[in-house]
Each structure stands twice: as structure tokens, then as C-alpha cells.
Amino acid sequence: MKNLFIVIVIFIISRPNVLAQEDLFDILEEESPQTKNFVTSTFKGTRILNGHSIENRNKGTLEFVISHRFGRVNLGAEELYGLDQSNIRFAFEYGLTDNLMLGIGRSSFDKEYDGFFKLKLLKQGAEKGSFPFAISLFGSAVYRSIDDFEPGNEPSSSERMSYTTQLLIARKFSPGFSLQVTPSLIHRNSVKIEDDPHNIFAVGIGSRVKLTKRVSINGEYHYTVNPLESIDATNSLAFGIDIETGGHVFQIILSNSITMIEKSFITESTDDFFEGDVHLGFNISRAFQFGKNKKKKLKEVKESNQ
């Protein structure tokens, strides 16, 4: 796929207010409400499309996620336009605290098992002069369990491991538009050929445009700085629709990536979106609340519609 250059947005930073000299208790009284007012629902769910969004599940929330990607649409009628082929991933994700989410999953592609954490570092303030971005740290580990190696050349458990570290930087510019930039580092303990880099750097960008309270359109693109040399790698591109219905978030996706784990769709995609190598897919999630009262749950539902 030919290189795709996306020029991204300059974030708008509001000038902070200057507090006058006052009594210490008066200052604390004025600042206290500001520290509690943060922007919510930058994205509808925990995924933009393929990649993670800035959003976490709140404390005590367990989410079951099913992700599915079919084969290429341009395979034609013989393969039912890709529907005869598929890759599926099941995952459980849990809000350990309001700021820390943990997850585990299993993909049919390469029989990969993955675990991840996502930690909120900074939140975007809702008041004028407050911090203009939301920032989270994401980390994952993947174990490739498929046995597709020649006898006597099987990799060790350590050689089957890959790791991803990402900084998720997002801003909700308005109720209808959000943007996220995602610098990424993917590390492989082993590579196919000597020229393949163990460490791959990439930069992703994702956006959300809200159409109604429950429907939005999303886009996502990841540019790889130093791609693998052993394959004809392409940059991951995806477009999709978010539909939210109560405890469900349903995403319909068109992407040139058949995989759904960061180390795979960022660095191992080989299809060209503009040549018709498009994979139809979907993500569907169901959230379950534990240990939360009805009042707090109602508040979260209202925030999700913002």
C-alpha cells in the first residue's frame, strides 16, 4: 500500500486563569470543584476500532468483548466475499479502579493469548484553563501458541512473546468531535530474519464524529516508522460506525487488517485498503456492573450519551 500521510490537528490549549492572593482556605474552596470536573465520553467505548481508545471501564465493571474480522471482500463469490474466512477474539476486561483497567483475550489468528493494562495518567478538564488532554498508558503482552515451525526448530516460550507499550493522548474538542494520537513501541523477543527489527515504532491517529446520542463514525490509522523486512507490510487503516444501546456497544468496521492485537495489526498487516483488500468486521461488548448503586449507574449512562 502506498504511503498514506495524514496531517493532524493542532490541539487548542486554553490559557489558565491566574488566582489572586487569598486566604489558603478560600483558594482550596475555589479549586476544589474544578478538580472534580472532567470531560467524559471522549470515545463511545474502550476501542476506537482496532486499537484502544482513552476510555476505561469504571471500577467494578466487567466487560465481555467479541471481535470478529472476515476475509478480504475482493476474494469474490467463491469465498462469499470473505465471509468464509474469519479471525475471532474473545476478551474479558475489568475496571480494577476508576483509573486502572485489566484485560485478557484469546485470538484464533496464530492462536494468540494476550493480557493488557490501561492506566489513566491525566484527565482532560472541563473548566477553562484546565488540562487540555487526557493521557493514558497502555501495555500488553502476547503469547503466540501456534505450532507452525519445522521439527527441531520450535521456539522457546520466551521467543514466542511480544510486547506493546503505548501512550494514548486524546482531546474532546466538542460534544461531536474527539481526536486521539497514539505513539507505540512494539517489541518482539524473536524475529523471522536478521533484518527484521526487534523494536518497531509507530504513530496512530483516531477520531470520532458524533452523529446522534448513540451513533458515531470513527476512523483510525497507524503509521509504522520501521516496518518488518520479512513481509510486504502496510499501514493499518480502518473506518467504522459505533452504535451504543444501553450496556452494549456495537462497532461495524472496514479495515485492511484481519488481526485485532496491537503487535499484529500495527506491524503485520499486508493488505492494501485501496486495492480492495478490505476486511469486514465487528466488535460487540456487554458490560456488567458489580458493587455499584443505581444512582451511580444512572449517572454513568447519562455520561455515555454525551
Where in the sequence are the language-model features?
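Charged helix-capping and loop-helix junction motifs
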Residues: 197-203, 233-237
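Extended, charged alpha-helical interaction scaffolds
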Residues: 190-191, 195
